[in-house]
From Swiss-Prot:
Listed name of the protein: Wee1-like protein kinase 2-C
Coiled-coil regions listed in the entry: 490-516
Polar residues bias spans: 38-48, 147-163
GO biological process: meiotic cell cycle; mitotic cell cycle; regulation of meiosis I
Species of origin: Xenopus laevis
Entry-linked SMART domains: S_TKc
Amino acid sequence: MRTAMSCGGGLVQRLDFSSSEEEDGLSNGINEAPQKGSPVSSWRTNNCPFPITPQRNERGLSPTQELSPSSDYSPDPSDKGAGGECPGTPLHYSTWKKLKLCDTPYTPKSLLYKTLPSPGSRVHCRGQRLLRFVAGTGAETEDPTLVNVNPFTPQSYRQTHFQPNGKRKERPEDDCSSDSQMKFTDKEHPSVFQSKRFVLRETNMESRYKTEFLEIEKIGAGEFGSVFKCVKRLDGCFYVIKRSKKPLAGSTDEQLALREVYAHAVLGHHPHVVRYYSAWAEDDHMIIQNEYCNGGSLQDLIMENNKKGQFVPEQELKEILLQVSMGLKYIHGSGLVHMDIKPSNIFICRKQTEVGEDESDGEDDVSSASVLYKIGDLGHVTSILNPQVEEGDSRFLANEILQEDYRQLPKADIFALGLTIALAAGAAPLPCNEDGWHHIRKGNLPHIPQPLTPAFLALLKLLVHPDPATRPPAASLAKNSVLRRCVGKAAELQKQLNVEKFKTAMLERELQAAKLAQDECLDLPPVSGFSCRGRKRLVGAKNARSLSFTCGGY
């Protein structure tokens, strides 16, 4: 179809297209610009008395505005034609559409082609969007190597699992995972995650604490922050949420908060260490989700006993010392030191167990089966090989730590554990300084009002020995015969075994006697008054018969 409009002898516009040419428009140069001197370049004349429409490139429309026929366009009076005589006015919709098809032939085929992704582009998968939080849009979310390095991770583990193995690992083109997934190549890779400042910052997300947890009550407070008892809305279980009191980002307490998270993550799960579930930052505050211990802390138990004038019995003291030493054995075996062992950092978990009518439970069984003592508050944890000691409570601090002698750091936990057991046994509160403090550092236990067995008392004195080399390590303390409940159980079981063996022997004797009696009944002796030859047995010997030899005079 060819159409031409004449205006004063000049050619105004020319439409030259056909339906058969639409399909070939894409391959024949969609973006080819008209050459100078072509008929298209002579669409405008200077002697046209009618208003003409300027080219789209002179308006500066965006591609979206150009493709939309319904886009509003208000002509600018300052815009004029090529000769400056006729202001530009919009064409009719049908004429505009024809011109558009002529200039850029967007056929259904070409439009479909433009909607397809380019080979180098990547389609982001939106699957499982409801299970994700929208992270912040800062620069820290774009760098895949912007992560913290856990200082408590063993060096051998880092070398084994963090370094690339030489093989190229890249995400395939059709993978729908997040863009933050790292790519390792042979030539370039991060040097085992150089520690970067991906620390406590406010994130552009809704409060996770308010969204996922229902706060029940405040159960504790300290220098670091407050502790709340909460119920998780999803699983309905109780957890402890520890939240810092003040913003930690950029403060001196920031590393202490991160140190506790690092230690929890490395230690994992142990029955005598408070379990760690998660940690995150909100408004520059650190929030840690830990296991809820329904028995409170050992400090709460000591205060309750002091009000009642009671003491923790010796058998329970042994149980506390045994279980805490097992927790310290696990911590020290992981290359870490707690550095803040005290009654307020030992927590009690009481199991809800029911005892049947036929079952009997002694004190030993009750303490071991229904009560667990766990070590918590890992804010002062440090590494044995690379110690960065942050002194804890001075009342439980060993003298060598005060002298900055870190050669036997695990023995500082043993010293603090001995004083903790002394407090649980009823000792007076420990002094913070002066003569009383130095008196204990010379190897003297504080006065314990209740009587203790000599073996247990000697063990407590050994724990606070002034020479750290003399104090027993946690591994040997957990196997000590004074503490191991299995020693008493073994003696009791051996006694029961001896009783059962005696009963079995008596039954065997009775069984043999019964067998002999049965054999005697079967083998009867011969009847008197009768002679038998050749040890023949008389028939009818057991029958009582009447024999008559009377003669009737016949």
